[in-house]
Amino acid sequence: MADNDIEEAVARALEDAPQRNFRETVDLAVNLRDLDLNDPSQRVDEGVVLPSGTGQETQIVVFADGETAVRADDVADDVLDEDDLSDLADDTDAAKDLADETDFFVAEAPMMQDIAGALGQVLGPRGKMPTPLQPDDDVVDTVNRMKNTVQIRSRDRRTFHTRVGAEDMSAEDIASNIDVIMRRLHANLEKGPLNVDSVYVKTTMGPAVEVA
């Protein structure tokens, strides 16, 4: 359970959000400090599974053949085989469109080298190289887990944003998501909470509310 300060900040952000004719996301903005973000080892870049879900559809594409492809077809948004990979390698525009439309990629481990060669220049800079699927991994479990995953990534910027829910989720559920993200962040930053300058939560069009 998240602490009351987080839940109160989320409740204020939801209450202060103007009414719109579309479903707004709820986002977290984190401001870092005392880190050399020119050093890749000090940057934030990892996936976090949200206990209450992301509140939105997460687009997942699987690179696979055979039985894995058949099983992935039931849960992934698209399943691509070696022939599809070859086509994408010859069509940079299509590869870029796919990368921009997809949140996460998963690939059978034997395909990773071919994917790196064919799509590395497209997926790499976007931070979207596939998660390797090992022989003992269940593709259905992996995809379902990633549907509730967000990527927290600072790159070389002091401030980064991540989705933590949607406006029709409860403040408690959104706060639980934020709590998991902050705990992971504190555990991985060099100085823990001391490397976090401030944290804000807001809906897409609403005002930012500081999380104490």
From Swiss-Prot:
It comes from the Archaea. GO terms for biological process: regulation of translation; translation. The keyword 4Fe-4S does not apply. It holds the Pfam family Ribosomal_L1. Keywords: Repressor, Ribonucleoprotein, Ribosomal protein, RNA-binding, rRNA-binding, Translation regulation, tRNA-binding. GO terms for cellular component: large ribosomal subunit. One of its GO terms (molecular function) is structural constituent of ribosome. Belongs to the universal ribosomal protein uL1 family. Binds directly to 23S rRNA. Probably involved in E site tRNA release. Protein L1 is also a translational repressor protein, it controls the translation of its operon by binding to its mRNA. Part of the 50S ribosomal subunit. This is Large ribosomal subunit protein uL1. It comes from Halobacterium salinarum (strain ATCC 700922 / JCM 11081 / NRC-1) (Halobacterium halobium).
